[in-house]
Amino acid sequence: MENLTFRYSITQFTYWAASSGAAAFATTYLLSKGVPSGTVGLLLAMAGLLSCFTQPILASLADKAERFVLTQMLLLMSVLCCVCFSLQLVNGLPLMLTAVLYMVGVWSSDVMVPLLNALSVACNGAGYSINYGAARGIG
């Protein structure tokens, strides 16, 4: 039985290192771009609500899939998140597009949390060893 704790620890670390910065500075960043404070609050709340509603849907899709789609779902959400935050570097984007892209980036980042947890369970179920507590502690 192969121990994947180190690999899973790196996955947790990179996820939390990337997503924590986006969440921690969301208000400051969007206000500096000229997004009104009420709109910032609304967008971040919508990202959280969308995450709450879509997480069970994605979990259901992953559970019902005939083949292992969890990694593909994580990859898709990661790419979407990267694209949304990378587009923030483009000068001259309309203000609302900037705000919505940031919201979608935060949403796609938030929705990955249960998928990362499910990845540990799936690997353990497939016969691999992962010390979730140690890996999550590193991440």
Regions found by a protein language model. Name each.
Residues 4-12, 74, 98-102, 132:
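Hydrophobic alpha-helix/TM-entry signal in multi-pass membrane transporters
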Residues 63-78:
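Cytoplasmic membrane-interface "Motif A"-like loop-to-helix N-cap segments
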Residues 1-48:
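Helix-loop boundary and gating motifs at the non-cytosolic
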Residues 53-67:
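Helix-to-loop junctions at the C-terminal end of transmembrane segments
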Residues 19, 48-55, 109:
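Residue-level signal for conserved functional micro-sites within the alpha-helical transmembrane segments
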Residues 13, 84, 91-115, 119:
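Hydrophobic core of transmembrane alpha-helices in multi-pass small-molecule transporters
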Residues 120-131:
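Paired intracellular helix-loop junctions of major facilitator superfamily
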Residues 50-52, 130-139:
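Glycine-rich segments within core transmembrane alpha-helices of 12-TM secondary carriers
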